Regions:
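Viral RNA-dependent RNA polymerase
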Residues: 1-405
């Protein structure tokens, strides 16, 4: 990958073809400025010697995050573009899933702008109230308000376990856009999760459950099988691999939940703004601009819901194609699949290739046949006198809990 070409304004350029026959373009420029060190406080003497620090706010950090989490994937010693799905693969492979899910979807209407604001808490309510006031004053432009501001996530980054971690990028849209689309999508979230649960016939999306309830659900899945095993599915950088075709399938589910044609059409217009993303990021010493077709933007209102929906639908379709009975535990792109030991080989065979044809790099984690070794959302089940509970890795927990950002 070469970033040596420079335009008339001094911007370095990366210009690559996308899956729509167009071009995804990245431009960046270094300016005079001092990178900002992000401050944190550590309680000394209580944690193992694990190096956990946040990234510096600088153009090099932001540029690397954009390159490796949006534009490129690791390919041996170098990089290549993320895999893209075969044409029409979502409508073909997920047709049976859609036929199962559609009758279970809610039939609803959007909440008012005011109700959406009232449902927010703290600083968010103030910001969305300001956005509502601006929208009522006529200050809403879909093209401008759907643009994204990107920055490096301020988080505790483990640099011991991962010797060269890639910074994570947050990419929110404007508050007026989020207000407009949020009144449709936010009330849908739990309803669609329940629809997914009914489609599978058991609790599937574990989002929002506490450590005790999560462990209870996982144990029920484990005990459903006579000779159980569990397989973790690791979708490498899931957001980066969400293609335009995947987004269109996901958006179709949302629109099907609204009774009135005018609501379907208005939501469709708002969601179409997520199909081609225009992003800008600034640091004290530089600026990044890029446009990209498809790709999940981490700050979108439907990031959590959409990732759960896509992952559950694909695992459902894959298990049906293999003829394997499974019990799925899902929390976005984090998945564990339970099944009979005798069906493990059938399930695993061809999985990576099947998901690659859907546009996703899916790795199979080592199979476990002890319940205590099941890992879900960086926790494992532990037996206590009061029952099962999900617990974090003790070393990592002590290190991260002794640091305040």
């Amino acid at each position: 990958v070469s970033l040596d070409s420079v335009d008339l304004y001094g911007y370095h350029i990366l210009d690559v073809p996308n899956d729509e026959g167009g071009r995804d373009c990245l431009r960046w420029q270094r300016v005079n400025g001092i990178p900002r060190e992000r401050r944190y406080v550590r309680v000394a003497g209580v944690a193992p010697d694990i190096d956990v620090v946040p990234f510096v706010d600088c153009i090099d950090t932001l540029l690397r995050g954009v390159l490796e989490r949006v534009f490129l994937v690791k390919d041996g010693p170098g990089f290549s573009r993320p895999p893209r799905p075969m044409a029409g693969v979502f409508s073909r492979r997920l047709a049976a899933v859609w036929n199962e899910l559609a009758p279970l979807l809610p039939s609803t209407a959007p909440v008012s702008h005011g109700q959406f604001v009232q449902d927010c808490r703290g600083c968010k309510r103030k910001r969305y109230q300001r956005a509502l006031d601006e929208k009522r004053a006529g200050r809403f432009n879909l093209e401008e308000d759907a643009r994204l501001t990107v920055f490096v996530k301020f988080e505790k980054t483990d640099r011991t376990t991962k010797s060269d971690p890639v910074p994570r990028i947050i990419s929110p849209r404007g508050y007026r856009y989020n207000l407009s689309v949020g009144r449709y999508l936010k009330p849908l979230e739990k309803k669609i999760f329940r629809s997914i649960d009914r489609m599978f016939g058991h609790k599937t999306v574990l989002k929002g459950l506490n450590a005790v309830n999560s462990a209870t659900v996982l144990r029920e899945k484990w005990e459903h099988f006579r000779d159980p095993v569990a397989i973790g599915l690791d979708a490498s950088r899931f957001d980066q691999h969400v293609s335009r075709e995947a987004l269109l399938w996901e958006h179709g589910v949302y629109k099907a939940c609204f009774r009135e044609t005018k609501h379907k059409e208005r939501l469709g217009v708002l969601l179409d703004a997520q199909l081609l993303n225009h992003c800008v990021g600034e640091t004290p010493d530089g600026r990044v601009e890029y446009s990209v077709s498809g790709t999940r933007m981490s700050g979108d209102m439907n990031t959590s819901l959409g990732n759960c929906l896509l992952m559950c639908a694909m695992v459902r379709a894959y298990a049906r194609a293999r003829g394997v009975e499974v019990r799925l535990a899902n929390n976005g792109d984090d998945c564990v699949v339970f099944m009979e030991r005798q069906e493990e080989r059938v399930f695993s065979s061809g999985l990576r290739e099947w998901f690659l044809e859907m546009g996703f790099n899916m790795a199979i984690e080592p199979t476990v046949d002890e319940f205590e070794q099941v890992e879900f959302c960086q926790t494992k089940p532990v037996w206590t006198p009061d029952g099962w509970i999900m617990c974090r890795n003790i070393s990592t927990a002590v290190v991260k809990d002794s640091i305040m950002l």
